[in-house]
């Protein structure tokens, strides 16, 4: 049934926090509508990557078309557009929301509203979506649907009288959800006769067919014989095929306004078919593109280096291929005195960084060294110019710069109020400015802080979860740059600057961080046959130092008794050799040492 009238199409997505049962609910909807046969069913059906199933998160968007017969006997087409729930992927979420008219807000009936759910709900409200609250996991012993309804009403302002209780695990409440989608989500605008415009909401790279683009037709129609124009990249393509996801791909001849489908057109790279771009026809182009297209800006940067120098071309190929399916990943070549050739990569956030690293190691079989993540600093120079620095090692000299500004975020933390003190302590340690505190219910509180992004990208999230036994959740948004007393902290190993260990820290914290860093490196760097000094410096001033003592080789082992002058000669020769070794010797710094920079907070540093 591909020729469904617009009035019988419903496009919707599911908004939920990680672990609140979004993928399980999607599985049940596919099963209940007969879209996926029971024998083909596997958990998290729409999460294609192994990594997604393992971590239990949705990274890339998927879409599925379901045929559904409503209670009054009419047939409908329901397009479910799956969305990632994590804050790093909010741009992916905003595009998928633009392709929908409604959203199921899934809230865990035992845990309540979480911060990232809220962020996505606000995005949905911005897009004028009809929101249907669903209380999931009501079969759990700790479920308290009435309290959660009150919470949703208090925090989001949604009327929860007709919230649907369900259990995605057992299938309870799923038929009611499908009926509610038909009854409450508005049909798409009937714009079949208007000029063709389609919104790209996802794309992925297929090694055989090039880029496969997922799109929603907003107006007009697209035929499999058309020639299309992508309005942001200004590129034109002959279509190879178009089709629908059911949820496996099925070819069709034509898709009209309101429908969701995919196209293949031998597109070489995902960057040519960017998410949020508008597809139109070459022979009858639309006057203007659909609103809301922005390029995803990387927020967190780190260096990626292969452990073996000859793997550099492989890493470049892997990044090229990964960028085909991940347009938010940015990278450029970089050389480091300590690590040789590698790449400086930009990511949307820490989770995005971890996932890219894991995919490179898994899918492309690479061994990588990853440097500590950093953010983009704005450096005001004495000559009046501005320099943006994403690599601490390239920070201009103190004599040339007037001030350094760093990005700040506004953070909202939701938690049970018994953890208030622990969270305020954490935010203060991280140079946070207290803004406000609101009680949502009698036992849940929202803390609002403004703090530097650099303090968030290391292990803020882990620390927050640890100090609140996993009960707190957070979301943050960028609010601009602020001046701070920042300095560059260098690490010298055996007198050589290890640029991969360079960090930018606040002046007041520099001594503690430096001290903790050299002590940590002393534990992690293996001993050599010569003494290795490890120093932390700001400019030319050494602020902390320690050294790794040499392994002593017993050169006198062969001298049984014998002449003292013979022993002296051997010891002198050894001392000479050590001197030469020290001058020539390269110290291998293990990967753990680079990661130690991240984890310094455990050692009372940054």
Swiss-Prot record:
Gene Ontology CC, one term: plasma membrane
Gene Ontology biological process terms from the UniProt entry: positive regulation of translation; translation
Membrane association type: Peripheral membrane protein
Database matches in InterPro entries: EF-4, EFG_III/V, EFG_V-like, EFTu-like_2, G_TR_CS, GUFP, LepA_C_sf, LepA_CTD
Cellular localization per UniProt: Cell inner membrane
Catalytic activity: GTP + H2O = GDP + phosphate + H(+)
PROSITE patterns for this protein: G_TR_1 (PS00301), G_TR_2 (PS51722)
CDD domains attached to this UniProt entry: EF4_II, EF4_III, LepA, lepA_C
EC number: 3.6.5.n1
Keywords tagged on the record: Cell inner membrane, Cell membrane, GTP-binding, Hydrolase, Membrane, Nucleotide-binding, Protein biosynthesis
GO MF term set: GTP binding; GTPase activity; ribosome binding
Function: Required for accurate and efficient protein synthesis under certain stress conditions. May act as a fidelity factor of the translation reaction, by catalyzing a one-codon backward translocation of tRNAs on improperly translocated ribosomes. Back-translocation proceeds from a post-translocation (POST) complex to a pre-translocation (PRE) complex, thus giving elongation factor G a second chance to translocate the tRNAs correctly. Binds to ribosomes in a GTP-dependent manner.
HAMAP family: GUFP, LepA
Protein name: Elongation factor 4
Origin species: Synechococcus sp. (strain CC9605)
